[in-house]
From Swiss-Prot:
GO terms for biological process: negative regulation of transcription by RNA polymerase II; nitrate assimilation; positive regulation of transcription by RNA polymerase II. It comes from the Eukaryota. Residues 156-169, 177-191, 394-413, 492-503, 617-642, 795-811 have a biased composition (Polar residues). Residues 48-59, 745-759, 848-861 have a biased composition (Low complexity). Residues 1-13 have a biased composition (Gly residues). The keyword Transmembrane helix does not apply. This is Nitrogen regulatory protein areA. Residues 1-75, 139-191, 228-257, 325-344, 394-422, 461-545, 579-675, 723-871 are annotated as: Disordered. Residues 604-613 have a biased composition (Basic and acidic residues).
Length: 882
């Protein structure tokens, strides 16, 4: 076929064409049309009749009229469509790459058209045809995809329950037929939206609602089967899928055991726990303990329920942890009496990574014993348990045991060198061999109803002399009223010289994040042994005298075995607060809620008797419950001064030691932590000293330095010095300020300034309120600007002795005075001081700062500014705030 005929078959010349181009176009066009009715990928044969395309390519179109056969091509030349000659596609069309993703067949046609459109007649109509063919091809494929998706969803709607429902039903449901009974099968078939089988079983009686039995014999459903675990056993009670499943040793043998089982949060939990009124929970982590809403009464009715709820424990480490002993799986399956499951602790104590700093003492009692969370209480079985119907939490609802996870830096661990932690496993040459506190009681009990009962530190008939700090005998196990028959006698199995009773426990705890061990000496072996054996008593100890002392009582200084007063810089966690009151222990009154606080870091550091290692305390501002205990057991607390303010037990500023340390000399060791002698605080970022060398906190020290007055506890603004900007108004400001003085609202004894006229000897010597500066220290020029307020004076130019008071003496008493008095007292003191200065040769005197401390009335060494210091330091104190 070498050309095309005219549209009507009339006369006219035949337009020469390119046969190869039309032949390829014919193949592509006809193939695309045939592809709309068939899905064959084979190329179709060439059609015998090509007349169906004659209308599209004839010259009978309006673009090419039939009578213009000689020169009809001028309309389609370069002047109108220059891009057809070049062969470039028009702007706005999709490129071949984009069309290749949509339809490969349409892409072939587009490539054919883009190459041959410059030589084709009727290019616009050919372009329209091409786009319509591509649109039909795309729509046809979309219809086929939609039909396939509808057929697949129709097949899945009549299949068995979904994978989510299989988790709540007995296992192996995917391989079993889906028809249980006629009613259930009709429901599944009729309702295509029924994708799950939800069994809502009341937790009160789960055995009364058995699940439907499944029968075999039908084909496997088309749903996606969920492979059940090999070790999973069919059970009658459903367990929600969101319950955590701790790592188990059996999972290592499963097919996908290396993949952690993700805890799913599905609608099953919301529906199943809606009747129980449990709020929607967050999705728990893999190892987080989940408290299932079941109780002991339910387990009595349905023993299989305990097998359905997964085991859990806070001490449960990974099953893939390295156990360096072969019997770790045997001696770690300790089943507690209060727990319904056989909890496996997975050998946490033998983990080589966590116990790098020493074996973890699971029952070491360094927490308050009256807390309900404590498990090491020896009298836990004697207490009444909280019933199930109580509004409080109790252990009848399964609570996990205490957390035994190690911390890398903040958990105090016994600093042992070896890896073995049992009692008699390996002998060691080193004196710091392994000592371990025994597990007295290894179960959790509910102490809620009995935790508020009073406890007594000592037996009321016991003598105090058995419990001094340096006594060699101490009872290392909790105080049982009778000797324990199951106790091992350490003298029969151990070397008597192996353990030292009076050993210091300074290096027993090493704080992981504390690296300031620069002051530790090398003597850390023989006298730094760890925990001694329980019951390692000497012959002087009385075992039959009842409960001598309660080892777990917070505030007892015998809570650590072999406790002595010598401590190093290591952190000691535990109830090691010394009972330093001198009264008798057998007091009738006791504290009901004795949740005592443990000793702080500063108390341990300040018990060191070496004066070279005296350090400034760093304490925590916790409520001082140990001070409350001392006040309840002490009615005759001795104070340094009768005006010393009493101690309050709930204030964070109250020291957990004596009321005030008192004046200490240079070589004297203080008996407690550093305490501010003004406000009695122990928590300050910086410690300062007054002129007498006594410690002040940062607030009191700065106040004394800036204002020249000891900081009052009830702060008044009249003691704060304001700058005198000019000399003109200084006298008026000082006068008005002197008239506003009032007595200090403080519990400290008020002491007035002793004037020089009270004693003739004091006028020429150092007195309490008047000091003589060095000669030449004060300028003798007459027009001195008064620093502080002075009484109203006459004209200062007069040279008479009675009128030269304002110029010959610089009165600094109202500014620099520690204790404020009435304005009349200040004026009288100023007049007497000026008279004394006139009688002693006109030398100016300065009424100076007298920062005596609260116990200054009983300490005569505090009556001066600097008792043994020179006048240069005195003048420095006088002028440091100018």
């Amino acid at each position: 076929m070498s050309g095309l005929t005219l549209g009507g078959g009339g006369s006219g010349g035949v337009r020469p064409t390119q046969p190869a181009a039309f032949a390829s176009l014919q193949d592509s066009a006809d193939a695309d049309r045939r592809s709309s009715t068939t899905t064959s990928n084979n190329p179709p044969p060439l059609p015998s009749d090509f007349s169906q395309l004659s209308d599209d390519f004839s010259f009978g179109s309006p673009i090419s009229p039939p009578h213009s056969s000689n020169a009809p091509d001028s309309l389609l030349h370069d002047s109108l469509f220059p891009e057809w000659k070049v062969g470039t596609p028009r702007a706005g069309f999709d490129g071949p790459d984009e069309m290749q993703r949509k339809d490969p067949l349409a892409t072939q046609i587009w490539k054919l058209y883009s190459r041959t459109k410059a030589q084709l007649p009727n290019q616009e109509r050919m372009e329209n045809l091409t786009w319509r063919m591509m649109a039909m091809s795309l729509k046809r494929k979309e219809r086929e995809r939609a039909q396939q998706s509808r057929s697949a969803s129709a097949r899945n709607s009549v299949s068995g329950p979904s994978g989510i429902a299989q988790l709540t039903s007995p296992p192996l449901i995917a391989s079993r037929p889906t028809r249980q009974n006629p009613s259930l099968s009709t429901d599944l078939t009729s309702d295509p939206m029924n994708l799950e089988r939800i069994f809502i079983v009341p937790f009160e009686s789960p055995s009364d609602h058995p699940s439907p039995q499944l029968t075999k014999g039908e084909a496997t459903s088309a749903a996606i089967p969920i492979k059940s675990r090999k070790d999973q056993v069919a059970e009658s009670t459903p367990v929600p899928a969101s319950f955590p499943h701790p790592p188990q040793d059996q999972r290592k043998n499963s097919e996908f055991g290396y993949v952690p089982r993700r805890v799913r949060k599905t609608s099953i939990d919301d529906r199943q726990f809606f009747n129980l009124q449990v709020p929607t929970r967050k999705r728990p982590a893999e190892a987080s303990p989940q408290v299932p809403p079941v109780s002991n009464a339910m387990l009595a009715q349905d023993p299989d329920l305990s097998g359905g709820v997964p085991d859990y424990a806070l001490d449960a480490s990974s099953a893939f942890a390295l156990h360096h002993n072969n019997h770790s799986s045997s001696h770690h399956n300790h089943t507690s009496p209060g727990m319904p499951f056989g909890l496996d602790t997975y050998g946490l104590g033998e983990d080589p990574i966590l116990t790098s700093a020493g074996p973890y003492q699971t029952q070491f009692t360094f927490s308050p014993t009256e807390s309900p969370m404590t498990s090491g209480n020896p009298f836990a079985n004697l207490y009444a348990h909280t019933p199930v119907a109580s509004s409080l939490n109790s252990t009848d609802f399964f609570s996990p045991p205490q957390s035994g996870y190690q911390s890398t830096a903040s958990t105090p661990q016994p600093a042992y060198d070896g890896e073995h932690s049992m009692f008699f496993d390996m002998p060691s040459v080193d004196a710091r061999t392994q000592r371990r506190v025994p597990n007295y009681v290894s179960h959790r009990t509910s102490n809620l109803s009995a935790s508020l009962q009073p406890r007594y530190m000592f037996n009321q008939n016991q003598d105090q002399s058995h419990h001094t700090g340096n006594h060699s005998s101490s009872m290392h196990s909790p105080g049982y009223p009778i000797p324990q028959p199951q106790h091992v006698d350490p003298t029969q199995v151990l070397n008597p010289n192996d353990f030292s009773t009076g050993a210091s426990h300074a290096a027993m705890f090493s704080f992981g994040a504390d690296s300031d061990n620069e002051d530790d000496d090398g003597n850390q072996f023989s006298d730094r042994a760890g925990l001694t054996m329980p019951g390692d008593l000497d012959d002087g100890a009385d075992m039959n005298g009842g409960m001598q002392w309660d080892a777990q009582f917070p505030g007892s200084f015998h809570s650590l075995p072999g406790f002595t007063a010598q401590h190093r810089k290591h952190v000691t966690i535990g109830p090691t607060d010394m009972m330093d009151t001198p009264s008798e222990w057998a007091q009738s009154g006791s504290l009901g809620r004795t949740h005592g606080s443990a000793a702080s870091v500063s108390e341990v550091r300040n018990r060191e008797q070496d004066p070279r290692r005296q350090k400034i305390a760093r304490t925590t501002s916790t409520p001082n419950t140990a001070q409350l205990l001392r006040q309840s057991m002490n009615a005759n607390t001795s104070h340094t001064s009768p005006n010393t303010p009493p101690e309050s037990g709930l204030s964070s500023a109250v020291p957990s030691r004596p009321a005030s340390p008192g004046g200490s000399k240079n070589g004297e060791q203080s008996s407690g932590p550093t305490t501010c002698t003004n406000c009695f605080t122990q928590t300050t970022p910086l410690w300062r000293r007054n002129p007498e060398g006594q410690p002040l906190c940062n607030a009191c020290g700065l106040f004394l330095k800036l204002h020249g007055v000891v900081r009052p506890l009830s702060l008044k603004t009249d003691v704060i010095k304001k700058r005198n900007r000019s000399s003109a108004n200084s006298l008026a400001v000082g006068t008005s300020r002197a008239s506003k003085k009032s007595a200090r609202k403080n519990s400290v004894q008020q002491t007035t300034v002793t004037t020089p006229t009270s004693s003739r000897a004091q006028s020429g010597a150092t007195s309490f309120g008047v000091r003589r500066p060095r000669a030449g220290a004060v300028r003798r020029a007459e027009p001195l600007v008064p620093i502080a307020a002075a009484p109203p004076k006459a004209n200062p130019t007069t040279s008479s002795p009675g009128q030269s008071r304002g110029t010959s003496s610089v009165q600094m008493a109202p500014k620099r005075q520690r204790r404020l008095e009435k304005a009349t007292d200040a004026e009288a003191g100023g007049d007497e001081a000026s008279k004394s200065s006139t009688a002693s040769g006109g030398r100016s005197k300065v009424v100076a700062l007298a920062p005596a401390m609260p116990p200054a009335a009983a300490n005569p060494a505090n009556h001066s500014i600097a008792g043994g210091q020179g006048a240069s330091q005195e003048w420095e104190w006088l002028t440091m705030s100018l």
